[in-house]
Design a protein with these regions (language model features):
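Short beta-strand motif preference
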Residues: 52-54, 166, 280-282
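Beta-strand scaffold of nucleotide-dependent catalytic cores
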Residues: 167, 281, 349-353, 423, ...
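N-terminal [4Fe-4S]-dependent radical SAM core
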Residues: 90-97, 117-164, 213
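Radical SAM enzyme core and accessory elements
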Residues: 1-120, 199, 415-480
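Key residue(s) within conserved catalytic/signature motifs
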Residues: 10, 145-146, 214, 256
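A C-terminal junction/extension of Radical SAM enzymes
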Residues: 29-40, 360-435
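Conserved non-cysteine loop/helix-boundary elements of the Radical SAM core domain that shape
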Residues: 182-383
Length: 480
């Protein structure tokens, strides 16, 4: 769909909304008037009034909208909201209202969290989403519930606190839906030991910086690809380095993303637990063996159950399990059965993701038929009903671009078991110091901005540029 801007250059605000509302229409920015299908977003700045108009033509039908506000009241966020609401209203002449209304960002809970922290009631925060951003009552409720968990988690934070993330960008094989930069052990097993050598250097260097800056580590998360691709001995080496070089005495949460059940055995799970980790994530994605095979996950539902039982025997305080709605070959009945099997295991956390088709994933090429948006909506609605009935509540929520049906990912927890790192990271509540290939350190600045520092994505690049990685850590800590 063509997009022409007149009187403003806030292309990002309008483009993101257009992608969310018309995901099946290819985006084509233009600089000149056009005929046929497309959208025009205009802004006229007068002495008294700031007037936004939008006109969208699609398949021979046209939707129009016009809004205005006083020029003196038009700061940048208000102007952006004016443009988006005008575009949204024009679009609603051509399609049914989406559940997320005019919101196009990945962190809708930031709005409700801010409202609660400013002293608004949950009812007032819900009303904000419904009236200002056209969000459905159901999604507004989910946002507020997740934000209430965020407010509770914020009470555990102190000004000197940070979280530490450690990335292990290796997996047994690549799943068809995955776009993470992760190297298959089948091809790159020779890089594991050199990668650990470099990572231990970064850990030691970061430990020195943490001590010098007076920062304390509140949560620690080991993730990215499949950390349990490492052997038990390699996991012990990694976690011993963390314990040796970084002060973990004030840690309130330690998580390892076990991920693929076929990489987990009793020895690894016992090793990880013995090193102080209390949270383990075991991610079946589905309990349907045929769907698992179709997306390239070389494990079975039975292996998931075995890994879970081994984790329980190892004594973890909390176990999370992930499911994905919208996988090829899945349907509402099969998805409901997967959730039923997961709930029968009684994990503390269940995270329900919606399939997001990203350019790096094999599924993006479109060679597999996917469930319809209606089927995915049925999966998610059924999951919410079942999880609430089992005593779970939402504790974090985020959206992704290119997600099936423009839905969301939701972390559900039993009382008192919310994943703190997930909240702190997703809500950007404090600085995240990240180590390893593909890791991104985020420094929260006093003025509310974030400064990002990216490590090289691929393991080989990370090895070759480890000196640059350490120098970049120095630069990041100068901002802390």
């Amino acid at each position: 769909m063509k997009l022409l801007l007149r009187g403003h250059d806030d292309r990002y605000a309008v483009e993101q909304l257009q992608l969310a509302l018309f995901p099946e229409e290819p985006m084509e920015p233009v600089a000149e008037p056009f005929s046929g299908d497309g959208a025009v977003s205009s802004l006229h700045t007068g002495a008294v009034w700031l007037t936004a108009t939008a006109e969208i033509t699609l398949h021979g039908k046209t939707g129009r909208s016009r809004r205005r506000l006083r020029t003196a009241e038009a700061d940048v966020p208000t102007r952006r909201r004016l443009l988006q609401n005008t575009y949204y209203e024009a679009a609603m002449c051509l399609r049914e209202p989406p559940a997320w209304g005019s919101l196009s960002g990945v962190r809708p809970t930031k709005l409700t969290t801010r409202a609660l922290l400013e002293g608004r009631t949950p009812t007032e925060a819900e009303k904000l989403l419904r009236t200002r951003y056209h969000v459905s009552p159901e999604r507004s409720r989910l946002c507020v519930e997740a934000s209430e968990a965020t407010v509770q988690a914020a009470q555990l934070l102190r000004p000197q606190d940070v979280s530490v993330y450690v990335g292990i960008p290796f997996c047994p094989t690549r799943c068809a839906y995955c776009s993470f930069v992760s190297s298959s052990i089948e091809r790159f097993s020779g890089l594991l030991e050199p990668y650990l050598d470099a990572l231990v250097r970064e850990i030691a260097h970061t430990g020195d910086l943490l001590r010098a800056s007076g920062r304390t580590v509140r949560t620690l998360y080991i993730g990215v690809g499949t950390p349990t691709t490492l052997s038990a001995a390699q996991l012990r080496r990694l976690m011993e380095a963390l314990r040796t070089h970084i002060d973990l005495t004030e840690l309130v949460e330690y998580t390892v993303e076990g991920g693929r059940p076929d990489t987990l055995d009793a020895e690894k799970l016992e090793t990880i637990a013995s090193m102080g980790c209390g949270r383990m994530s075991i991610n079946p994605q589905t309990m349907n063996d045929a769907v698992l095979a179709r997306v390239g996950r070389r494990h079975t539902a039975a292996q998931t159950v075995a890994a879970y039982e081994a984790a329980r025997a190892a004594g973890y305080d909390a176990v999370n399990m992930d499911l994905i709605a919208g996988l090829p070959g899945d349907d509402p009945k099969s998805f409901a059965d997967s959730l039923r099997q997961v709930l029968a295991l009684d994990p503390e956390n269940v995270t329900v993701h919606t399939l997001a088709l990203k350019k790096g994933a094999d599924l993006y090429a479109g060679r597999m038929e996917l469930p319809s948006a209606d089927d995915v909506a049925q999966m998610l609605a059924g999951a919410e009903t079942s999880l609430r009935a089992a005593g779970y509540t939402p504790y974090y929520l985020y959206r992704q671009k290119y997600m099936s049906g423009s839905f969301e990912n939701i972390g559900w927890c039993r009382p008192g078991t919310a994943g703190l790192y997930n909240i702190y990271m997703m809500e950007e509540m404090h600085s995240i110091v990240s180590l390893g290939g593909g890791a991104m350190t985020k420094i929260n600045l006093p003025d509310g901005r974030l400064e990002r520092f990216h490590n090289p994505k691929f393991p080989q690049q990370y090895l070759e540029r480890i000196d640059d990685v350490l120098a970049q850590k120095d630069a990041a800590f100068r901002l802390l």
